[in-house]
Amino acid sequence: MPDIACQPHQDPQGKLNWVGMSGIELPIKIEQDSQTLTLSSQVQAYVSLDDPLSKGIHMSRLYLILDEMGSNAPLNPASIQTLLTAFIESHQGLSQNAFVEFRFDYYERRRSLKSDNSGWKHYPCTLRGEMRNGQFECEISISVPYSSTCPCSAALSRQLIQEAFEQQFNGQDLDYNQVLEWLGTPEGICATPHSQRSYAQVKLKVNAEHPLNLSNVINQIEDAVKTPVQSTVKREDEQEFARLNATNLMFCEDAARRLQAKLESCPEYKDYWVRVNHLESLHPHDAVAIVTKNVPGGYSDEPNFMERFQN
């Protein structure tokens, strides 16, 4: 059968940075503790077209390599490196560089704060790999929701409570039980600080030997911010959630610095990029802070916007 992709190209001639496919629907395998999950993903796959005389690449070869990997090998940095090597080998004489990206939704059961319950939580994830001039790079991206309570609003609320107390008991001699009883009334908490669902968007550069453990990445992020959103909640869980928010008041700057400190303590990450988004309940806009590891040739500090963080 004729294959015009193998015929020489005439005019105009030129090399192309990337040629390939996007929106590929592919089941993938992700290892989670002692089990292997099968998840649906959307994939981009590309190779460079380095021969200006070639009409094009062989897209079916990329697809077949992807299909074989998705059916057999769990997705991790090592398997992505193997995949990219196979992309380039399948285009000998045409391509020196390769790129792949997997976007998927990772679900995990997370325990409630106090009660003996657990529930599903959803984390949008992306795994990217690139082989350029023989050098391999791999990136893990994840979006983790948490709660943030405004320190300024908390201080203003405390002031109103103090004023209400003074107005109610001005000049009176009080005993312990009177104060305790008043604190349990609606008037005892006449103002509450505003809080909001917030998102930590994190990109991590890892080596090929890095064992992909998304649960560990989630734990590191949630341990840093201290206020992860909850799925299954009983009254004791909601009360503990309120306590955690009160003891972890955060501007977006505070959340970014907490994540910075956590990731700096993790030698397994060659580089990181963090964007925290506080979806303000007080304002119609978001409060945002961005931090990178600032390694030479590493992530840019451009405030680009990761997609799907509100999913």
Curated annotation (Swiss-Prot):
Gene3D superfamilies (UniProt xref) = Urate Oxidase
Q: Which reaction does it catalyse?
A: GTP + H2O = 7,8-dihydroneopterin 3'-triphosphate + formate + H(+)
- Gene Ontology MF, one: GTP cyclohydrolase I activity
Q: Which UniProt keywords apply?
A: Hydrolase
Q: Domain of life here?
A: Bacteria
InterPro entries per record: GTP_cyclohydrolase_FolE2, GTP_cyclohydrolase_FolE2/MptA
Under Pfam families, the record lists: GCHY-1
Record-marked site positions (May be catalytically important) = C150
Keyword flag Metal-binding: no
Q: In which pathway does it act?
A: Cofactor biosynthesis; 7,8-dihydroneopterin triphosphate biosynthesis; 7,8-dihydroneopterin triphosphate from GTP: step 1/1
Enzyme Commission number(s): 3.5.4.16
Q: Which GO terms describe its biological process?
A: tetrahydrofolate biosynthetic process
State the PANTHER family in the record.
Answer: GTP CYCLOHYDROLASE MPTA (PTHR36445:SF1)
Which family does the record assign? Belongs to the GTP cyclohydrolase IV family.
Q: What does this protein do?
A: Converts GTP to 7,8-dihydroneopterin triphosphate.
Q: What is this protein called?
A: GTP cyclohydrolase FolE2
